[in-house]
């Protein structure tokens, strides 16, 4: 993080644009329609819908808050993070979208990453607890070959390396925060 005024001005400009995408309840509209200049969502593809993955958007807000101390940034970040309750199942997994049973390991790792970073700044225990529940769910789904499926409750059946690497990194960070060897 820097004190370079030009970089900070650009960061604020980008953050202000992002803030326009955040609804009053903290959900994030995923993209802007260029013709109308309005943020929107679409059922065309999974990443054009509101979802657990957008919890990660709290990170740049909190990073700028740490420099600027502007309260609206931490308040908005907490609004975004508090939406974990809309997406997290009782078993700890995160639904990709609030209106489905589909779970995607990659988007779940985004939610965990956002909540873990938010915990490091806010010390809100429910963020850390949510991360632990999600990581425990991941551990319970490790298959005999050491993998975890990318999708659950979805037509596609595949496995991928990148979310496993993310989950391992998040387990290590969580252990560091907890000063434990749980994961």
Please name every model-derived segment.
Residues 1-183:
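Glycan-recognition and catalytic cores of secretory/periplasmic carbohydrate-active enzymes
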């Amino acid at each position: 993080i820097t004190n370079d005024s030009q970089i900070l001005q650009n960061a604020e400009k980008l953050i202000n644009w992002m803030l326009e995408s955040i609804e009053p309840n903290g959900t994030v509209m995923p993209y802007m329609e260029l013709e109308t200049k309005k943020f929107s969502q679409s059922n065309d593809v999974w990443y054009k819908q509101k979802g657990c993955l957008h919890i990660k958007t709290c990170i740049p807000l909190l990073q700028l808050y740490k420099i600027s101390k502007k309260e609206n940034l931490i308040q908005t970040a907490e609004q975004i993070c508090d939406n974990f309750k809309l997406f997290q199942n009782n078993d700890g997994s995160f639904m990709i979208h609030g209106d489905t049973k589909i779970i995607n390991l990659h988007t779940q790792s985004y939610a965990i990453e956002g909540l873990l970073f938010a915990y490091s700044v806010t010390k809100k225990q429910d963020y850390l607890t949510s991360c632990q529940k999600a990581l425990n769910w991941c551990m319970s789904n490790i298959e005999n070959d050491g993998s975890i499926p990318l999708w659950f409750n979805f037509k596609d059946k595949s496995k991928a390396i990148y979310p496993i690497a993310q989950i391992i990194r998040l387990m290590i960070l969580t252990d560091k925060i907890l000063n434990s060897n749980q994961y």
